Amino acid sequence: MITSVQILSLLDQGLVDYSQVDALQRSLHEEVLAGGEDTLIVSQFTPTWTAGRHTKPQDIPSTTIPVIRTDRAGSATWHGPGQLVVYPVVRLKEPVDLVQWIRAVEASVIDTVREAWGLPVHR
């Protein structure tokens, strides 16, 4: 169970570069593994496609938007203006159903945005 978490909001920087946030996430991951504080990164990206390990060429439309290959599972994902992205960089202290945990975090973020700002957010 996570008891406290640092929130690192990049929203005041406007749209940020995916690669920079990816590097930050990896650095924070190393810190957390070494006993550092759990962190939520909150950001919004410049238009970018990320291509997971299962991405096929036809998964990404022909476009001038940059495509960044990632080591994550899955296929293509678009990131861009109007999309709030939250990355939890945490040490899970006990075995958990990871998909269920991610869905719970996602639901909490959606509920918080809806309640705090009254925005019509959805998954």
Tell me the role of every PLM-derived stretch:
Residues M1-R123:
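N-terminal lobe of the biotin/lipoate ligase/transferase fold
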